[in-house]
Amino acid sequence: YAKFAVSCRKVETMTQQLRFIPFKSRSDKGWAEAWALYEASFPDCERWDGTGYDRAFGDPHFEADGIWRGDEFIGILFHWNAGDYRYVEHLAVSPRLRGQNMGSKALAAFCQGRRVILEIDPPEDEISVRRQHFYQRLGFVANPYAYIHPSFRRPFHPHRLVLMSYPEALTYEEARGFADFIRERVLRYSEHENPELPRL
């Protein structure tokens, strides 16, 4: 399939090869399965609609990767290139692969040689605590800054998140620059017209 030749990053693991292949449009091979996984994995407030992706595909900072093991689609990793770091916006692995550590393998592979930032819910219950520990086992650090993120879709409900960074903590200036990047670039593809958040 021709699209497989475009910017394919291969990552060797102990028993298999993972490939990160960027989608360029919603007509690409695997997008329907990727979209179904996306909708099943994230609530409405954390998702864009399809037209937002149509516009974002033309942004050189954005990449929507399908994760493949051979010819088998296994997950998604949607991320942004902010120059000094990558922002992982959405990561999900097919539920049929639970127990195989594919999420940790894919994220560890993606992080090699990079600075990476992502957001998680505050560790206030068993699930959110487990999620934070998952990222910490991979080398991510929780940052102490007050960070409020608006939802992507109406009605907007700002919510507190924790910034996790790899392989080291963020300075305040770095965290503030990240908030500016989200507000000024990422949210232009959401339903916001003039977002005021996030800010530090």
Please give the residue ranges for each predicted region:
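Conserved beta-strand in the GNAT
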Residues: G66, D71-N81, Y85-A92
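Conserved GNAT acetyl-CoA-binding A-motif
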Residues: Q112-I127
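Conserved beta strand-loop-helix elements of the APE1-like EEP
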Residues: L163-L170
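Conserved acetyl-CoA-binding loop-helix of GNAT-fold acetyltransferases
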Residues: V93, G99-Q112
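Short, Lys/Arg-enriched N-terminal segments with co-localized hydrophobic residues
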Residues: Y1-T13
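Conserved catalytic-core motifs of GNAT/GCN5-like acyltransferases
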Residues: E119, Q132, Q136-F156
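A short helix-loop-beta-strand connector motif used in the catalytic cores of GNAT acetyltransferases and
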Residues: A56-G66, H157
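Short amphipathic alpha-helix that is part of the acyltransferase structural core
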Residues: E12-G52, L161-L163, G177-R199
